[in-house]
Curated annotation (Swiss-Prot):
Disruption phenotype: Cells lacking this gene are only slightly more susceptible to nalidixic acid, but are more sensitive to UV irradiation than the wild-type. No visible phenotype when grown on glucose. The modification 4-aspartylphosphate is found at D9. Gene3D superfamilies: HAD superfamily/HAD-like, Putative phosphatase, domain 2. Mg(2+) binds at D9, D11, D172. InterPro entries: B-phosphoglucomutase_hydrolase, Beta-PGM, Beta-PGM-like, HAD-like_sf, HAD-SF_hydro_IA, HAD_sf, PGP-like_dom2. The keyword Cytoplasm applies. Catalyzes the conversion of beta D-glucose 1-phosphate (G1P) to D-glucose 6-phosphate (G6P), forming beta-D-glucose 1,6-(bis)phosphate (beta-G16P) as an intermediate. Phosphatase activity with the reaction intermediate beta-G16P has been measured. In vitro interconverts beta D-glucose 1-phosphate, beta-D-allose 1-phosphate, beta-D-galactose 1-phosphate and beta-D-mannose 1-phosphate to their corresponding sugar 6-phosphate product. One of its GO terms (biological process) is DNA damage response. This is Beta-phosphoglucomutase. The gene is ycjU. Its main location: cytoplasm. GO terms for molecular function: beta-phosphoglucomutase activity; magnesium ion binding. It catalyses: beta-D-glucose 1-phosphate = beta-D-glucose 6-phosphate. The active site is at D9, D11.
């Protein structure tokens, strides 16, 4: 089967705003008397804003202290902090090798999609000047389930009009790898410590079209 689509996660694959998310969550958590560190922040990668908040409240033993309206307000304020910090994002924030890979995929006439749980994904792609490379971006606001559920990757495949079996998914988080595998796509992991990735690369610098092409032909 010919490779028809490549679907990217955003944070940690195309750019790295994890530190901005962490700073925003850390401030919100501190305001309600919860301390979180960088190690705990690893458990928030690849999941939705609401699920991140739930885990923070659970971590601090305060899961029952906030009703749905109060939780929504906390999540809203976190997003305001995060969006404010995105003003420092420029084209230089694209991770190494990604822009050239996107150009190569376009030259090969392979559809490119985005499967990010971030509601700010369109804003980020625009700031990075990458929007033109993406045929379809899954709308996180329309999803019922967060990763590791495969819903977002299946939505991206549907948006591209290609079957999951003809796609590669690229992720840097365990929840994302699990979601890709559950969708029936081929999985590529970026970074160490990811289990189940069918191809594991140390960084985006190793993520090239020749490498993806060879991987596809050998699976």
């Amino acid at each position: 089967m010919k490779l028809q689509g490549v679907i990217f996660d955003l944070d940690g694959v195309i750019t790295d705003t994890a530190h901005l998310h962490f700073q925003a969550w850390q401030q919100i958590a501190a305001e309600i008397g919860i301390s979180i560190d960088a190690q705990f922040n690893e458990s928030l990668k690849g999941i939705s804003r609401d699920e991140s908040l739930r885990r923070i409240l659970q971590h601090g033993g305060k899961e029952g202290d906030f009703n749905s309206q109060e939780r929504a307000q906390l999540a809203y304020r976190k997003n305001l902090l995060y969006v404010h910090s995105l003003r420092e994002l420029t084209v230089n924030a694209v991770l190494p090798g990604i822009r050239s890979l996107l150009a190569d995929l376009r030259a090969q006439q392979i559809s490119v999609g985005l499967a990010s749980v971030s509601l700010n994904a369109p804003t980020i792609l625009a700031a990075l000047e990458l929007r033109e490379f993406f045929t379809f971006c899954a709308d996180a606001s329309q999803l019922k389930n967060s990763k590791p559920d495969p819903e977002i990757f299946l939505a991206a495949c549907a948006g591209l009009g290609v079957p999951p079996q003809a796609c590669i998914g690229i992720e840097d988080a365990q929840a994302g790898i699990d979601a890709i595998n559950a969708s029936g796509m081929r999985s590529v992991g970026i970074g160490a410590g990811l289990t189940g990735a069918q191809l594991l690369l140390p960084s985006t610098e190793s993520l090239t079209w020749p490498r993806l092409s060879a991987f596809w032909q050998n699976v």
